[in-house]
Every structure is written in C-alpha cells, then in structure tokens.
Curated annotation (Swiss-Prot):
Comp. bias regions, Basic residues: 360-372
SUPFAM superfamilies, alphabetized: EF-hand
GO process terms (BP): lipid metabolic process
Organism: Aspergillus niger (strain ATCC MYA-4892 / CBS 513.88 / FGSC A1513)
Disulphide bonds in the chain: none
Sequence ranges of Basic and acidic residues compositional bias: 135-145, 232-244, 344-359, 373-382
Name of the protein described by the UniProt record: Increased rDNA silencing protein 4
Length: 504
C-alpha cells in the first residue's frame, strides 16, 4: 500500500485557482530537487507497513512528495503577495485537516487544489530555513493608508469665489445639487490588480475610513425672495447681478471645505449686498425703482370695481297721493332712495285729516300694541257672538225633547206646553260634564241660567249656559249674575239683523 497523498502518475501539481502561476524556474532545477529527495521514497518495507497499519503515527514519519517540493520552490520565487497567500492557504489547510488521513482508492471526491500540509522532518529543515530567510529579506510593505493632500483654501479666497461665481436663480423647494469640491471626493483605499491583496483587518479599516469621509448632505435651498417676483421679465436682464449676489451671499455652502465659512459670510451678508449694489450702475437702480412702481400701479388698476346699482323706479301711484295738507312730522321723499336695503312691504295709505272715519277710528292705532287695556276687554262679557250662538244652538237642537214622556202621558201641571223644545236636566248635565269642570262649578252655571226651576232649560238658557262654560275654560271667572246684553244676544233670530227702524 502506498503512502497517503503520493501520486506517481501526476508528475506536476496544479497550482491553486486563486494564485497566479509565476515564471517557470530554470531548466533542471526541479529535476535536481526531485532526484535529491527521491532517496526518501526508498525506505524499508517495515516502515511502509507501519504507514499502512498504524495511521495514527503517520504525522511523525511522513515525507514530502515531489509535487509539494516543486510547489514550494516555485512559490519561493514568486512575488511577496503570492507568498503570503500561499502560506495562508497552507495554514488554513493545516487547521481544517482532520487527524485521520487514511483514504480509500475508490474516493469519488474532487482532488484538493491546495498543497498538502508540510510535516516537520529532519530532511526539509534546510528548505524551510531558506524560505524563511528569503521571506525576511523581502521589504516590508507599508500598510498605512495614504491620503491625498487636501487643498487648503483661505477664507478670503473662498469668499471671493462665492461672490464672483455666477449662479442661476434658485428653484424653490428643491434640494441643492451634489456637492463639488476638492474635499468632497472620498478617498479610494481599494486598489485593483494582483499586487494589492490586503488582510481582512485592513479592509475593515478602509471601510471605516471611507464611511467617515462621506460628504455632508446639502441643506435644502432657501425659498426665493418675494421682492424679485414684482420686477417685470424685461428688466430681469439688467438686474440679474443684484439678485444673484443677494441669493449667493445668503445661501449656505454645501461642501464640507467651505462649511466653516458659512457663519462669517452670513454675518457679513448685509455689508456684501450693499457693496455689490454700490458697484452697479446708478441707471440700473433707477430703472428697477421705476419698474417696481409701474408694477404696483398695474396691480391696482387690475382690481375691478363693481358698477353702482341702478336707481329704483318710483311707483306711479305714489305720485298721485301727494296731498297739499300734510302733518308737520311728515315730509316728501325728494331725496334719492337709499340703496342699502330694499323695501319689501307696502306703505300704509295716507288718509286726510278732514275725513270723518280717520277721526273716529284714530284710537285704534296704538303706539304700544302689547300694552294691556283692561277697559277694552269688557266687550266679551256683554254679548255672545253670532258664530258661538250658532254652535250652541246646534247642540240644543240635537238634544231637545230627550227623556220626556209622550204627550198623552204628560201631566199639564208638571210639563208646560212647550216642553218638547226644552232640554232635560239629566241631558244638560251629561253634556256639560264633558267639559271636565268640577261639579260645583257646573252647579253654579245651572243656578245662573235656570229661571223656571222645573228641571228643564229653554233654548236661550241652554245657549247661555254653554257660553258660560266656555268662558270658564278660557280662564274667566263666573259673573254673579248674567248681564242683560248676554240674554239679548242669545234671543236673536238667526239670519235676521234689525239695526233700527226708520222714524214713522
């Protein structure tokens, strides 16, 4: 059984994928080295049997293969960066290799591209010392990050550049453009090519430095000045410098290099504006004043004033009612009518003083319509209205003659001959009780209207009793006796009105 990792069929070993193949060594050097170490392969069979039988002791007696020696010698003559990568690959392979190295011949896995680990033997001590010596002779690469020199600008030069730099009018509510300047470019610490493989720690430090050198985000632009909008378009060409210097002195710089000058330029913004305006032509300033005045005049003229309302037409009937005799407090409407409020109600017709009706009904016009007049309220107690009398007579006509015995059974002493036109006391009590007045109040009403005391009510008595109940329901008190005017209004014949007879 052959030792593990030794292959006689492959004379040369493929280099790793991540390492570029350097220049080939001189002819014969590889063969000499292979021949020098070929004696180590011819060992006694007892040692080979020990390799085959005891895999745990293979780390102490294992020899290096020709492929490993050739790869190590080739790596020794390559660039220092490649040597570092080779040693790194070897150390990683040593750390990740398990303790048992016995493999079967029928292994289907792909061959390892990395070289086999180097085991410490007495034969390869010279080669290792040679490699260490050659590595020590290499110059140590400075791994510090080199930064580009930052151009230093004095505050005076930065202020001059900011004042002289022509800038277009600012757009409102838009962020400023990407900052441009010598200090705004981030330092690129990553280099391209095979000669710049850096350790992982260097990459982390470069990322940290790159994050710290990111330029500050530009603040949003200031809104435009309101005074600039009143100038017409034709005059903007003459006064563009004044507007540019005004906006340029008040805008905050977006680059980190000039950020320290923002406070100084902001404090001296008024002085720079006056200095820049004094440098302009006097004719341009006068043109700006005239243009602003014209713009204000045009704005005031554009305001439309509503036309005055047309005068109201005077009615014809009003001119016909011009009486020669008028009261002292009255006056004719000679002036124009008021345009504030239009009159919607008609004016009351004016009546002459010599008219009899005006003098007779003058007391009906009251200055205080809500004032109480107790003397004028006596009329309701004096008579019954025609409407009320007709309603009460309808109730009497529907209930007269009820509960009376027939005419041939009536006693002449108990019932008068007109008893069929009367209302029985039981029927009257039933009708009046529907008013929900107390029984003693209804008894008082019965005593006031019952003049015959026979238990029957005539038409006038029933009508007056109904009227008294309605007055009680309206809130009026019962009188001690019924006035004669009330009895007279109840005895009228319906449909006939006799005001007075002519003299005979």
């Amino acid at each position: 059984m052959e030792p593990v990792g030794v292959s006689h069929n492959t004379p040369e070993m493929d280099p790793p994928r991540n390492i570029q193949t350097p220049e080939l060594p001189e002819s014969g050097s590889v063969k000499d080295k292979i021949g020098k170490f070929s004696a180590y392969q011819q060992q006694p069979s007892g040692l080979k049997d020990a390799f085959g039988k005891t895999p745990t002791s293979i780390g102490a007696n294992r020899s290096r293969t020709p492929q490993q020696i050739a790869a190590q010698l080739a790596a020794g003559r390559s660039t220092p960066g490649e040597i570092t990568a080779t040693h790194t690959g070897v150390s990683r392979t040593q750390g990740s290799r398990p303790t048992t190295s016995k493999r079967s011949d029928d292994n289907e896995g792909p061959p390892l591209l990395a070289p086999k680990p180097v085991w410490a033997t007495s034969a390869n001590t010279a080669s290792v010392n040679k490699l260490l010596r050659s590595e020590a002779d290499l110059p140590i690469r400075d791994k510090s990050i080199q930064r580009r020199p930052v151009a230093q600008i004095s505050p005076i030069e930065a202020a001059r550049l900011a004042a002289k730099k022509p800038r277009p009018p600012p757009v409102p509510r838009k962020p400023a453009a990407v900052a441009t300047g010598p200090t705004s470019v981030p330092i690129n610490v990553h280099s391209k090519g095979p000669e710049s493989p850096e350790p992982t720690s260097k990459n982390h430090s470069s990322r940290h430095l790159e994050d710290t050198t990111i330029p500050f985000k530009a603040p949003p632009a200031l809104p435009p000045r309101t005074g600039a909008s009143s100038v017409p378009r034709k005059d903007l060409t003459n006064h563009r410098r004044l507007l540019d210097t005004n906006h340029g002195s008040r805008r905050r710089p977006s680059t980190p290099g000039t950020a320290s000058l923002y406070t100084t330029s902001l404090s001296n913004s008024t002085t720079s504006l006056l200095d820049s305006s004094s440098g302009l032509d006097e004719g341009a300033l006068s043109d700006a004043v005239v243009a602003s005045s014209r713009a204000s005049v045009r704005a005031s003229q554009e305001r439309k004033v509503p036309p005055p309302p047309p005068p109201e037409r005077r009615a014809r009937s009003r001119s016909l009612k011009q009486f020669p005799h008028t009261a002292k407090g009255e006056h004719t409407d000679s002036s124009s009518p008021s345009t504030h409020l239009r009159q919607t109600l008609r004016e009351p017709t004016k009546i002459a003083e010599n008219d009899e009706g005006y003098q007779r009904h003058k007391h009906l016009i009251r200055k205080h319509p809500h004032k109480h007049h107790e003397g004028d309220r006596r009329r309701w107690r004096s008579e019954i209205t025609e409407k009320e009398r007709k309603r009460y007579e309808g109730v009497w006509a529907a209930n007269k003659g009820l509960l009376l015995p027939p005419a041939h059974l009536r006693v002449p002493e108990a019932y008068p001959p007109e008893s069929s036109e009367m209302v029985v006391n039981l029927v009257a009590a039933d009708i009046w009780s529907r008013s929900r007045l107390p029984r003693h109040v209804l008894a008082q009403v019965w005593d006031l209207v019952d003049g015959q005391h026979i238990g029957l009510l005539t038409r006038e008595e029933f009508v007056v009793g109904m009227w008294l109940i309605d007055q009680q329901l309206k809130g009026h008190k019962l009188p001690p006796r019924v006035p004669a005017s009330v009895w007279g209004s109840a005895k009228r014949i319906s449909g006939v009105h006799i005001h007075g007879l002519p003299p005979a």
